[in-house]
Amino acid sequence: MRKWLIGLLLILGLCAGFAQAETYVVAVDGTGDFQTLTEAAAASSTGDTILLRTGVYGEQETFPIALDHAVTIEGEDGAVLDSPRFKTMVSVTADGVTLRNIRFQVRKWGIVADVSRAMTVEDCEFVLGDEECRTSSTAIWLRGMKDCAIRRCTFRQVGICIAGDPLSDKSAGKTVLTGMCEAGEDPEYFSTHEIADCTINGRPYYYFVGQDNLTVPTDAGGLIAVECDNLTVRDIDVSDSSMGLEIARSRNVTLENVSADRCGIFGTYLVFVQGAVLRNVHVEQTNHGIDIRGSQNVVVTDSLALNCDQGVFFTHCTDCTLQDSHVQGCGFGYFGAVGNGNRIGNCTFSDNADGIYLQNEPNATITACDVRQSRVTGLRILKSSCVCTDTTVADGWTGVIYYDSHDTTIENCDFSDNASANMYLGNGRGATIRNCRFSGETKAHLEVEGTQTDMLVTQCTFTGSRADMLKAASHTLPTFTDCAWSTPGVFWTGKEWNGSTDGDAPNRNCDIVQIGREAPRADSVPYDTPEQAIDGAVNYRKENSGRYLLLSQTNWTFRLFD
């Protein structure tokens, strides 16, 4: 009898559980249970269903609409979610969420699914709602998501992006998508989904997992390929998407004759790839044109990046190469970070903010490149080491910035007509600048700041006056050997002051000679001869060791600066 009662109670409990599932109706005109999806989602519980009647759900909603429990949202034909600009529409943080038959007017991110499982998206339409919001917009972000099913959906100018967990204090040292999420350390973030019967811009949206020796059909409008060996992608156009193509955890990949223009996130994205050749890849007006992360032995050749927010990215890459390619009109032409042994050869960079930017990038090689018209810096070397040879950096703002870097050789290069400075050295150590030519219209061939340790400039030629073209706010200078100046001019470093701490001379070696750096202080003192100027400088520095001295060759006036 007792067992029978227990069984009956279990059955009644199950029935009660099923009975608790509710169906709510949302209607803009007030004929449903709620007028907004925001309210319905907040009122619903696990297992409930929300029916979204025909209408546009926009200004009245609070975005993002949070789905933190398993709920099904199903729209009637004509049910539209329309978010404001730069707003995420739906945030999913629970397992088992279903969205069906809804049109998303995307102006940033449509659905963002974070660290959850088993989301289902069926029969939905995702459309870029505003051309001005294209950059960084995407229909579906899967961030740390597993077992997602996306079926019979249509995408126009936005697509699907797959990555790892949102950034946290555990992300340090991992490959990341800067400011957004980790690239995805867990293979299941990429491989456990179902993307079926979907189209993008009227063409098939392909998702392949574990298919070796695959050649992707040329009718592809979008591509996600995971754990494929000997993958060939040839003669396809994946433009007008979020990520035109995403290839993850694959080996021996060939991309050839691929276009990925006007993509909001990345045009061509390779992550955790072992061995690839990208040939004749064209990216234009895309956020990140060619983006390679966490990969080894990737070669990008004969490719073109035009007017992208960022041109070519190599981050956390090893032994990768960019060669015989052109990057123009981008933010960073090439950005390399936290990799090792990567190479740039025979490339041209023009009219970018930074032509080449190395950050925390050891053992890089730059050979036979032409970098011109950089709006900020032609070659920026930050906390990195490299060998740069046979390269021209010209017609920009600052030619080279070498800052807080080490163990670098710059040899047989030309630096000319960079308006602010042909080369800036800040806190450098262990660099050799050999057999280079500095010329053209510029405020300085070399501008030096901070501490210089084991820095050598040798066998270089400089046009103009040494007093004009070497400028510094530094206590130490590189060592110059066998260099030639068109006009030697006056240059004096006061070496007798080095290391003096006895009170008879300044404690720091921070005097430098130059002309016309900026307006002098009102108390500048004129002298009639160089000898008088030097004597005056010595006496002044004994009393004012915290100031810089700058000597005008024109009238032998020491200009005093705090």
Language-model-detected regions and their locations in the chain:
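Bacterial N-terminal signal peptides
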Residues: 7-15
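Acidic Gly/Asp/Thr-rich repetitive segments characteristic of extracellular carbohydrate-active
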Residues: 23-58, 515-559
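Beta-solenoid repeat scaffold
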Residues: 49, 58-81, 92-100, 192-204, ...
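Sec/Tat signal peptide C-region and signal peptidase I cleavage site
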Residues: 17-21
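Extracellular beta-rich repeat passengers
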Residues: 86, 101, 106-145, 151-183, ...
